[in-house]
Amino acid sequence: MRILETRVYRGPNLYALWPVIRLLIDLEELEDFPTARLPGFSDRLLEMVPSLWQHGCSYSEDGGFVRRLGEEEGTWMGHVLEHIAIELQVLAGTPVTFGKTRGEHLPKGQYHVVYSFVEEEVGLAAGDLALRVILHILPPERADYDSSPFDFRQELESFIELAQRHALGPSTAALARAAEERDIPWIRLNEGSLVQLGYGKYQKRIQATLTSETRQIASEIASDKRLTQRILEQLGLPVPRQSIVCDPQEAVEEAEALGFPVVVKPLDGHHGKAVATNLKTPGQVREAYEKARRICPRVIVESYQTGNDYRILVIDGRVVAVAQRVPGHVVGDGKSTIAELVEEVNRDPRRGIGHEKVLTRVVVDDQARRLLAEAGLTLESVLPEGKVFYLRLTGNLSTGGTAIDKTDEIHEDNRIMAERAVKAIGLDVGGVDFICPDITRSYKEVGGAIVEINAAPGFRMHLSPTEGKPRDVAGPVIDMLFPRGNRFRIPLAAITGTNGKTTTTRMVGHILKLSGHKVGMATTDGVYIDGV
């Protein structure tokens, strides 16, 4: 059994209205060996990929595919490859369901195996791995098909890692789904998060949560924490006192002038990188300064704000979500060491590396060790049952934090404050980092401070909070880019056939041009726009 040809259809095609991969396979001798004639094959397949039990196949119910495997005649290997390729993508976090296997108009033993995909590289790899799975579990009398070593668990882990590398981030994926729900087509423009929404002159672009409507000057202001603080201060909005410093000694002097504890952070930074909070000694300030300057040569020393850490998301001038961010932490059970508790936390399937999943793994770094040392603890210490220990001082999800939805609880004064702040910076989508004792009470009453305004804020904490109600924060972005009634498609015509395709295309283009349209045309001769 081997793959003779691979075709990728990236748009509507003969088989489906969505992208599919078509493999031309030759079963060779296996044409005479459907699953019913391969003793133990089905059992070994289901032992290796037990989630295939959920495939309905032609029976449209769980277990349908398994019934096909066990029927008197069984099913052929092309059909098996189709289902494995689909399931591998599902296991890697890509929800695809469509597939079909057909042998019409092909030589005996050859079949077209068609299955859907989201990421092309992942879909192609799924087909290759599916073939290797089949060859590996063939019964002994067919073992001469492939005798190379094969560790399915390791192969699956490598495949999932490939899928995670190629997958859209959570925020971009949510925006793409919101576009699909509104029948807005989208195209990925690079291997990162740059996505085109809509076609032609109606298109918009997003890169994560930056949009084609985001002003560059607004992003520049938001990235300059000192400038942001000054603008907000001029409007009478609550901000901490801060200074820019250029060497460790100056950082210590400013910290002493502000009064300990203080915060040290890079002037231009993201995702909480090199942000050190609650610094209480000159030595800690010097150490934090050195780390911050690796991110940006200009460093900020800021008064430390006590209270809870909130992210207020503002889209198109309106607060759409609020989350309380809780720093990465462990909870004692009276038996396990702190190191073991961290391992247990990271076993949560929702946690991954970086921004690939809903939550990020907790990493024990210098900041965590400093907090342990200050508390007289080590990684080998055992916490009493129920005792919470924070391994971070900031609640960024990118450093292992969790989120609690507070959208319905924000006080009206705090909502207005956040909307004014984002409007002052000029962002269409902005995240306000706000520290206060209680978001349900006005900052005018209990105090609080805006410590940062974020361009391109992450959506993870709102889409999938650890506690509370998930919020649709992607929909408002799409509705802002494409208000109700606005167009997002241009008329497209596809011309196919045996002969005369280019001539017919030119004729149609000419007729449309005479009607006053600016026509784009792609033929075997080249690509033309308005005749050029």
Name every feature range the model reports, one short phrase each.
Residues 364-383:
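C-terminal helical accessory/scaffold domains
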Residues 1-181, 318-321, 326-333, 337-340, ...:
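ATP-dependent carboxylate activation and anion-phosphoryl transfer catalytic cores
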